[in-house]
Amino acid sequence: MLLSGCKRKVADDAVFANDSVTNCAKPAQKEFKMYTMSPMAALMEQMYAENNQLKKRIIAGESVGDFPKHIVAIHSAVMTDETDNDAFFKEQAAKFIKAQELIYADAANAKTHFNNAVSSCITCHEGKCEGPIPRIKKLYIK
């Protein structure tokens, strides 16, 4: 008699009662936890996408449109780590909003103001969370 399972052949009259390969036992699995973005992370993703579109409009010489007022939520959005919401962050957030407002208030110099806004993002991320910096740098208009 020949038994097979789990791609392993078992000889006649063999006893492998505790052999996990023969029994096809699966190791205990850790519970999978789905990552959910904090409201701040979601806002930053939204701002990145919007600024990427804004970059394209500036390069094409199109209208920049109106200042997206939801950006001011950067002051109140819940962060992944609330200890990051300190004086440095608040100062950098204010600089970012000012740079963003200038893009729309002075469209003739939109490229300069846009690049200043990108620089303000990088300055903040250098002090808080460096991970997104390479991605943010791609926003610069050359």
Map each language-model feature to its residues.
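C-terminal motif of bacterial Sec signal peptides marking the signal peptidase cleavage site
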Residues: 3-5
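Sequence contexts marking disulfide-bonded cysteines in secreted/extracellular proteins
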Residues: 7, 23-25, 122-125
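Extracytoplasmic c-type cytochrome modules immediately beyond a signal peptide or single-pass transmembrane anchor
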Residues: 10-117, 133-142
